[in-house]
Amino acid sequence: MARKTPIERYRNIGISAHIDAGKTTTTERILFYTGVTHKLGEVHDGAATTDWMEQEQERGITITSAAVTCFWKGMDMSYPEHRFNIIDTPGHVDFTIEVERSMRVLDGACMVYCAVGGVQPQSETVWRQANKYKVPRLAFVNKMDRTGANFFKVVDQIKTRLKGNPVPVVVPIGAEDNFKGVVDLLKMKAIIWDEASQGMKFEYTDIPAEVKETAEKWRENMVEAAAEASEELMNKYLDEGTLSEEDIKAGLRARTLAVEIQPMLCGTAFKNKGVQRMLDAVIDYLPSPVDIPDVEGTDPDDEEKKLARKADDGEKFSALAFKLMTDPFVGQLTFVRVYSGVLSKGDTVFNSVKGKKERIGRIVQMMANERIEVDEIRAGDIAACVGLKDVTTGETLSDVDNPIILERMVFPEPVIAQAVEPKSKADQEKMGIALSRLASEDPSFRVRTDEESGQTIIAGMGELHLEIIVDRMKREFNVEANVGKPQVAYRETVRKTVTDVDGKFVRQSGGKGQYGHVVFTLEPQEAGKGFEFVDEIKGGVVPREYIPAVQKGVEEALTSGVLAGYPVVDVKVRLTFGSYHDVDSSEQAFKMAAIFGFKEAARKANPVILEPMMAVEVETPEDYAGTVMGDLSSRRGMVQGMDDMVGGGKAIKAEVPLSEMFGYATQLRSMTQGRATYTMEFKHYAEAPRNVAEAIVAARAK
């Protein structure tokens, strides 16, 4: 079966933004104009096509990235047909993992900003993630019809807050109630959309006199940005004083793909203006799978050996599983992005991370919550596979005879935990199945059993994250559960180096005994460096075969620190000396010696408690700014700055310990009469002050 759309005409894009910037509405309009949906789905009435989980429709926020395929020929039908695979990403900070996951498999992104709210906290997080994966992007300023809308202020904020380099390719005609359309700076014509046709029809007209000067100024800015793409274009611009439409597009495209600039557009998705021009910009400026560097990976048999795969049907098959979903009708769906080669239903592929073969049952392409079965998918495609038994998010599927491991995604450690128990005994087993299924879908969500209390503990990225998990258990698996109070995920570490600490495990009372003896040096590592074990044994004083058991013992000891039993992080253990007994030594004896030795060393090395610090940003009317700052300080918060917001009001940034933030939403509402909002995301671990640490230790001792 031949390819229907040439790969050069593919665009794999994500639409990402802060909550309420109108991202889902923007995606809806895209699906409407590209002919997928016939009645526009509004988030206002809980009917948007991409928000297909029940909780999303209730809460009006997008949680899971739905992947949708659609086609576009340009708003005036002047382009050959292009195929868009659109991933709608969530805008709530508790779901950062979803954004990170989609950034990994996208080729380009459309960042949606609110013309009133401007650049908000989540916009910064998403921008950082897009930088990390070097994703070329466009910016779309939405809600131009709202009171307080200001396009140029958002342009400034992208420069100052995000350190971006925005280049408007349209400018608005009017704003607020007066927003009529945009000036296309390439054609130097006004575009006015016809409201009766829901924006399906439009006309080019002359630029209104009141925006002529603004349009000329910004056109000059755009042409200069395009000219900087190459010496040839710069010389042409200097000689002729301008550039042709083709040259401008080519220059802007080259610089967008190099992540040097971000073409910027505006409109109002809700009123059906501007999204159509943004779709043309996706074709003009965002990359196809062949415009990005070949995907790189390693050989499963030799981590040092680097491999690459071209975005080509003729290459050996490789794909990344970037999302798992449980579907009520077909069971487990595994979303994959194909980087090279062809995958047909019935094929056997190799999970190169786990070293297992998998058979592809069926392949479906998603039109939001409608699915179309296909026989095969090719390089550049995004689709869902049915029938994979043991594939987790972030794993690579490849050709059986030519395996490759693509760059793994790194998922953050959870910062908040809660005990959860089923309301009835009958639900006990169902709860276990539900939680393990949810954990395989979402790597930032963990499940474990507390050894002392026997309780099931769930951990995640924030209160909302865990709330939604419990909610999904109820809806999708019919498991009713009681949830305990949220617990902070503290950690322990050490602050000083101790040398020559003995760890001994000796049991010798007739018959075969036990003998293990190790000597450690324990030292702190810089934050975030993790655990390191160094074997410095000389002359076989601890035999080779026992060294892995020593490391295993240390790793086991790390799970429970000496102060309050929290996991120990950021330490280096050097095994420097030891002794053994010809008959009585065993792996078990050395493992026990290592556990005792590590605990002893940790007690002497000035152990401390670490607590998770959160980056908190509060947006509040100016009158309440003082109260909000005072309250953050009383929560042991460090206020780091205050910015003016586009539509008035203040954005206050602070770093606050997570333990002080429980119940903050209610407190903030009452302090500001419900007029302030806040977002919070994990920043790093920091040493807890002595009085706080003592209280934590005392609470654990009870």
Swiss-Prot record:
Query: Pfam families, from UniProt?
Result: EFG_C, EFG_III, EFG_IV, GTP_EFTU, GTP_EFTU_D2
Primary residence:
cytoplasm
Q: Where in the cell is it found?
A: Cytoplasm
Pinpoint the tr-type G domain residues: 8-290
Q: Where does GTP bind?
A: 17-24, 88-92, 142-145
Q: Cite the entry's keywords alphabetically.
A: Cytoplasm, Elongation factor, GTP-binding, Nucleotide-binding, Protein biosynthesis
Give the matching InterPro entries: EFG_II, EFG_III, EFG_III/V, EFG_IV, EFG_V, EFG_V-like, EFTu-like_2, G_TR_CS
Q: Name one GO cellular component term.
A: cytoplasm
One molecular function GO term is:
GTP binding
Write out the GO biological process terms.
Answer: ribosome disassembly
Nucleotide-binding as UniProt keyword: yes
Query: In the UniProt record, does the keyword Cytoplasm occur?
Result: yes
Q: Superkingdom of the source? A: Bacteria
Database matches in SUPFAM superfamilies: EF-G C-terminal domain-like, P-loop containing nucleoside triphosphate hydrolases, Ribosomal protein S5 domain 2-like, Translation proteins
- Gene3D superfamilies for this protein: 3.30.230.10, 3.30.70.240, Elongation Factor G (Translational Gtpase), domain 3 (3.30.70.870), P-loop containing nucleotide triphosphate hydrolases (3.40.50.300), Translation factors (2.40.30.10)
> Of which family is this protein a member?
Belongs to the TRAFAC class translation factor GTPase superfamily. Classic translation factor GTPase family. EF-G/EF-2 subfamily.
Summarizing the function annotation, the protein's role is: Catalyzes the GTP-dependent ribosomal translocation step during translation elongation. During this step, the ribosome changes from the pre-translocational (PRE) to the post-translocational (POST) state as the newly formed A-site-bound peptidyl-tRNA and P-site-bound deacylated tRNA move to the P and E sites, respectively. Catalyzes the coordinated movement of the two tRNA molecules, the mRNA and conformational changes in the ribosome.
What is the protein name stated in its UniProt record?
Elongation factor G
Taxonomic path: Bacteria, Pseudomonadati, Pseudomonadota, Betaproteobacteria, Burkholderiales
Q: Which gene encodes it?
A: fusA
